[in-house]
């Protein structure tokens, strides 16, 4: 009986010791538990590098005499922007992009230099009206996707594209990879030029004209800063 009482007294003493410890350090325990679950993922910022990137617009020949015309391969020469993302999980992420509308130029060798100058002049003055609308911009509203086993991230970027004074919501699929301090995004998407009130150039009295669908392709490099 005495041994049983001794065990009970020892157990009660142990419980009292735990109670004293908890009473002495309640704030420390609560703060540590909260901080481990509420810290947001670190954000990494990348600046787009136009010099190391490729950004193209393809305008297709259309009209009754479409076979008399040529597709146009237009390069975007001057653009800037920023990507923000969580380095381990990619998401949450955001993209902001600004293009100088007077930097779009014809690149196809099928055209002579004189023809390219005429096309570029029409792009600036008739199609994009660069003096009135000097910038084309895109700002993401949401980024979703999944990380593949090889480290490539398949992303779907939804956002607002503003061109020729008109803003429309578009989706951009992209394959994103990261190596060291560099980020690379590749993909393509289409827009309807009529949605942005962009005029089409034509020839042969309108029997050859640029189609409504414009195809954008990109291979963009960005650097962490």
Regions found by a protein language model. Give the residues of each.
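Bacterial N-terminal signal peptides that target proteins for export
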Residues: 2-16
